[in-house]
Amino acid sequence: MRQDFQALIKQWWQEIGVETELKVIDASVYFGGDAGSPDTFQKFYADIEMYANFFEGANPEPSLAKNICSQSPGPDNQWQGENTSRYCDPAFDAHVKELSGIIDPAKRAELGRTMNDMLTKDSNAIIPLVYRGTASAHANTLGGVALNAWDTEIWNVADWFRVKQ
């Protein structure tokens, strides 16, 4: 599926005059994290990459916190760190610290949106393009199930019940 998306994007870019070279790397190498390999996602020696990361749950903090300056992989930390876009903004780092101290859900959501905008529309460090959908199902005799794209399938298991037939 990933290669199909890449081919489509390459075609779109070609239509507007942008040349693109696709490089296919075995997933075990790309996601392997071998500090000696030039082809890991931590190093990523290219101008743009496609990845399918998203956070699970209603709490954006763990996902956003991956983008602080100190999480940028590089030779000084043996290519460890989750900030593979290497986005670095001290204001964003300060927001991560601030977010960890906020309890009110509405205030957390507001700051989370601000931080998301910093990563996306304000800096283009991350450009959301496609959400790869997931397939979920449940028995017709099970009520109260509320599936969503942002949490595990059993996030509201306490609300489930058997439907009387």
Question: Model regions: which residues?
Answer:
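Periplasmic binding protein-like
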Residues: 14-75, 111-112
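Solvent-exposed, acidic/flexible segments
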Residues: 2-6, 24-27, 84-92, 101, ...
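Bilobed "Venus flytrap"/periplasmic-binding protein-like clamshell domains
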Residues: 1-11, 124
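Generic hydrophobic alpha-helical scaffold/packing signal
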Residues: 10, 14, 31, 96, ...
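Short, solvent-exposed loop/beta-turn-alpha elements that line the ligand-binding surface or hinge
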Residues: 35-44, 65-97, 101, 130-165
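Bilobed periplasmic-binding protein-like "clamshell/Venus-flytrap" ligand-binding domains
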Residues: 41-52, 100-140
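Hydrophobic aliphatic residue packing
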Residues: 9, 16-18, 137
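Residue-level detector of functional hotspots within protein domains
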Residues: 4, 8, 78, 113-115, ...
